[in-house]
């Protein structure tokens, strides 16, 4: 199966997606400071 892009074209095509994903990385140290939630809250029941 032949690809329609050369390696350089493919990298140029996906580079913006990769950069966007890197910007959205999660700060695990900060997330560990958050209170633990129960299964009901996880399911969307906030009563």
From Swiss-Prot:
It comes from the Viruses. Arf may be recombination-related. This is Accessory recombination function protein. The gene is arf.
């Amino acid at each position: 199966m032949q690809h329609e892009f050369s390696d350089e074209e493919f990298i140029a095509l996906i580079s913006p997606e990769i950069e966007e994903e890197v910007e959205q990385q999660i700060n695990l140290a900060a997330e560990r400071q958050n209170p633990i939630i129960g299964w009901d809250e996880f399911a969307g029941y906030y009563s």
